[in-house]
Amino acid sequence: MSSDDQFTSIQWDRDELGPNKETKVNKQETITEDDEHHNNDNEDKDNDTTKSNEPENIQEDDETKDDNEPTDSLILSKTGDENISNIESQNEGDHIVGEPDVNQEPSSDSQTEAYEINVVVTSPLRDLDSSSKPYISYLLTTATNHPSVMKLSTVKKEQGKEVVEITARRRYGDFRFLFDCLSNDHPEVMMPPLPSKSNFKYLTGDTFSTEFVHKRLHSLDRFVRFITCHKVLSQSSIFHLFVSDSADWSTFQKNLKISKVGVQESDADKGNSSMTSNVVNKVVNEDLLTETIMNFLTPSKHKRETNKEILEISDKLKKLYENLIKLDKIFTKLNKKNHDLSVDYEQFSQQIMKLSVIQNSSDETNEPTTPEINEQKQFATNFKVFASSLSYFSDNWSNLHKYIDESFLVSLKDCAKYIISLTNLIELQHNKKIDLQVLQDYLNKAKSELQGLGGSHNAPPNPIITHNNGGIVNNTTQLIRDTLSTSATPNIGSSVTESKVTKLQNRITELENEISVQSQLVLDLTNKIINEEYPNWDKFNKIELKESLLGLCNEEISFYKGLVDNWSDIELKLLKRLDELK
């Protein structure tokens, strides 16, 4: 059967299906859009099946009709002839399977609006594991009405209450495992950064210090709150298991091994070592390794970003990041001065207390009279009152320094890290766009080469036969010479040319298919950044900065208000003493 007959039979099958097929395809598209965050595995399987069944070349009227279908950019697999013969039966099977899923599961947006998950990380506690090694665990308190979390939890819903409060303890390794799982499942989503592991702390023994633990506590709490505010990450099943108090979390963590690229893991069953890799991790690591080199080798015309919205977002992120870094430097210097002042006032208070002790000791040795004793006791009391006020002043400076160092500065650093995370996602989109432009250049080059080879495929010229050349033998000889000299026919002396043309045609087909796939990926990623990831980050960042600044203002107000009240009381006592001396 020729290719024309194959595509004609496909056209007849589509004509027989008529509008019913279009309705079914539209239903399947709705399912795909609604369940894109919950049924990723099923979508990949359906897309692969559809890709293997869709013909490579479609008539013009079919292209117009398929613009609204979800398979508009699908390509023909290598076994296209076999799949084309079964396209009708497979498509019908796909639609029959897809139709019952219409009302099974609501979309992630509707679940985000209907249900809420509020998680707070508090109460760090030092504990020992099975091997008697110390670690810090953090208390997760979850208030939610989400059915998935309630189903996994052992806490039962009370009558008259819509929200269930669930508590569970997690250590830093659990947060790291959650981060790795979400990164692998959603590589196109902005992932909130975790606090650094700070391996050097293990060398100095400061991993269990109050300062280090509180800083990590605030960062982990911010990490979880970002996930709860995200429409995709908050609906992830692994996150629901993480916040629940189910005993399956430890089992799931032990059994699921997230492989890393370039790391050898021993296979106990086979008795040898094998290189394990994950597709997403492999792609990300390869991008990180080759990004600098490829960008250096790529022509400068491909490095320019043309999307105005992406440019505006990048410019805003850059300016905000620079401002946050400046604020961090300013408050770090200011906080260091606060710490120095607290130490100075503490030393000043100790010296005043020593003066009161010296005054009492000198009075006891001189044996003064009764009026003198009362006056000297009042002097010692005044020294103690002034020393206590200085000590109160020092404690307030110390508390303010502690809040700025463990909470406010950590929030500024975390906001800067979140900007870097979103910038990395934009950089990934830009690199994908560069790859697409390079593929387009390769396609244009291949087409020009094919056109150059195809230009020689012309009919042989008609030989000129005259009667002056000496008869029919000479004319026949001249005809053969002219025919052999042209070498323009596709059947004589053109096997090498045919091989080149075939290779170029196959290369062009592969490039066109890859460009169609990459174009859709770049378009989806760009729309996701502009319409979802950036607005979600912007909302979260505004809330975090507002809460941080409000917390700093409250601490400053309480600090100065306490100083005013304390020094006002001290001032009244000292003025009263001056009046008595007069």
From Swiss-Prot:
Coiled coil listed as a keyword: yes
Xref: PANTHER family: SORTING NEXIN-4 (PTHR45949:SF2)
A GO cellular-component term linked to this record: phagophore assembly site membrane
UniProt-recorded name of the protein: Sorting nexin-4
Coiled coil: 300-329, 494-529
Chain residue ranges for the region called Disordered: 1-111
UniProt comment concerning the protein's domains: The PX domain binds phosphatidylinositol 3-phosphate which is necessary for peripheral membrane localization to the perivacuolar punctate structures.
Function: Sorting nexin, involved in the separation or division of vacuoles throughout the entire life cycle of the cells. Involved in retrieval of late-Golgi SNAREs from post-Golgi endosomes to the trans-Golgi network, for cytoplasm to vacuole transport (Cvt), and autophagy of large cargos including mitophagy, pexophagy and glycophagy.
Residue positions binding a 1,2-diacyl-sn-glycero-3-phospho-(1D-myo-inositol-3-phosphate): R171, K197, R216
Disulfide-linked positions: none
Principal location listed in the UniProt entry: cytoplasm
Lineage: Eukaryota, Fungi, Dikarya, Ascomycota, Saccharomycotina
Biased composition (Basic and acidic residues): 12-27, 35-54
Domain PX: 116-249
Database matches in CDD domains: BAR_Atg24p, PX_Atg24p
Record's compositionally biased regions (Polar residues): 1-11
UniProt source species: Debaryomyces hansenii (strain ATCC 36239 / CBS 767 / BCRC 21394 / JCM 1990 / NBRC 0083 / IGC 2968)
